[in-house]
Swiss-Prot record:
InterPro entries tied to this protein: OTU1_Ubl, OTU_dom, Papain-like_cys_pep_sf, Ubiquitin-like_domsf, Znf_C2H2_type
Keywords tagged on the record: Cytoplasm, Hydrolase, Metal-binding, Protease, Thiol protease, Ubl conjugation pathway, Unfolded protein response, Zinc, Zinc-finger
Region (S2 site): 245-250
Gene behind this protein: YOD1
Name of this chain's protein: Ubiquitin thioesterase OTU1
Keyword Cytoplasm: yes
Role this protein plays: Hydrolase that can remove conjugated ubiquitin from proteins and participates in endoplasmic reticulum-associated degradation (ERAD) for misfolded lumenal proteins. May act by triming the ubiquitin chain on the associated substrate to facilitate their threading through the VCP/p97 pore. Ubiquitin moieties on substrates may present a steric impediment to the threading process when the substrate is transferred to the VCP pore and threaded through VCP's axial channel. Mediates deubiquitination of 'Lys-27'-, 'Lys-29'- and 'Lys-33'-linked polyubiquitin chains.
Location of the region described as His-loop in the Swiss-Prot/TrEMBL record: 217-221
OTU domain segment(s): 103-228
Enzyme type, top EC level: hydrolase
Subcellular location(s) of the protein: Cytoplasm
Zinc finger map (C2H2-type): 272-296
Keyword Cytoplasm on entry: yes
């Protein structure tokens, strides 16, 4: 049995029930049922960088097409092709069109790794994996270590080696430097919506990326943003086009609503407690000074 995933506009989900001996037409039928994109209108991409699959012969076996366990198939709809689908697909598509999708926050745990969990969730098309943080921390450390000239002490605030050791620790919080690195790695614009200032910081804005993902930030905690259809089992959308400015406006509306409800943390005034020595602290500056003096980096908000 092949362990496959499919990624479409609506999100990422498992693609079960196929083997290397399954035929292309069987896989396309399964993809149509999952994504709502009829087989005649499908354009399938595989690998990195993504390459287009030859769909001319539906009788070919998946093994012959170079499809292996662990692969993710990207499903796009070619609107230039006829899209007459089965009644089931047509009915599902009609129901989806009648509903209005909304942009919403997907809450993740406040466990010092919320940034990494949130970024993984959005770039993977809605895959929630709280165990992804160690791998992402290690990835960032490898990228930083590989380019000590670009990632020097002036940029990192500590030596390259110290930073690499620091970011691997599970109690270390991620921030702007890590978002910038992940934007380059995933080749997508990462927009961080700040609920305190109601502004959007766009990492990778000038890099020419075609994809955009969004996080919402309250001063200490990150959550991913997703566009979803209420009361529907249709997977949420977390990856947007960089030409989609509507989603940016919706994100600012969310941030403004959170600000009016005071759903943010003023990092200069919030009260913390060092979870190592139990000392009370006020604001980010005191926390940083305490960490520098004692080496304690595990803080909880009071």
């Amino acid at each position: 049995m092949l362990r496959l995933r499919c990624k479409a506009r609506s999100g990422t989900q498992p693609l079960p029930g196929l083997t290397a001996h399954s035929r292309l037409r069987d896989m396309q039928a399964a993809l149509a049922a999952l994504t709502g994109v009829p087989a005649p209108a499908q354009r399938l991409l595989l690998g990195f960088p993504p390459r287009s699959l030859d769909l001319s012969d539906g009788e070919r076996r998946l093994g012959e097409l170079g499809i292996h366990s662990g692969d993710t198939l990207i499903v796009e709809e070619d609107t230039s092709k006829p899209s007459a689908g089965s009644p089931v697909v047509a009915k599902r598509t009609m129901a989806v069109r009648e509903a209005v999708p909304v942009l919403a926050r997907r809450v993740v745990p406040a466990d010092n790794s919320c940034l990494f969990t949130s970024v993984y969730y959005v770039v993977e098309g809605g895959v929630y994996d709280p165990g992804c943080a160690p791998e992402m921390r290690s990835l960032i450390a490898q990228i930083v270590a590989s380019d000590p000239e670009a990632y020097c002490e002036a940029v990192l605030g500590k030596t390259n080696r110290e930073y690499c050791e620091w970011i691997r620790r599970e109690e270390t919080w991620g921030g702007a430097i890590e978002v910038s690195i992940l934007s380059k790695f995933y080749q997508c614009e990462i927009c961080v919506v700040d609920t305190q200032t109601v502004r959007i910081d766009r990492f990778g804005e000038d890099a020419g990326y075609t994809k955009r993902v969004l996080l919402i930030y309250d001063g200490i905690h990150y959550d991913p943003l997703e566009r979803k259809i209420p009361d529907s089992d249709v997977p949420p959308q977390t990856i947007f086009s960089t030409t989609d400015d509507v989603v940016l406006a919706q994100a600012l509306e969310l941030a403004d609503e959170a600000r009016r409800k005071r759903q943010f943390t003023d990092v200069n005034r919030f009260t913390l407690r060092c979870m190592v020595c139990q000392k009370g602290l006020t604001g980010q500056v005191e926390a940083r000074e305490h960490a520098k003096e004692t080496g304690h980096t595990n803080f909880g908000e009071v």
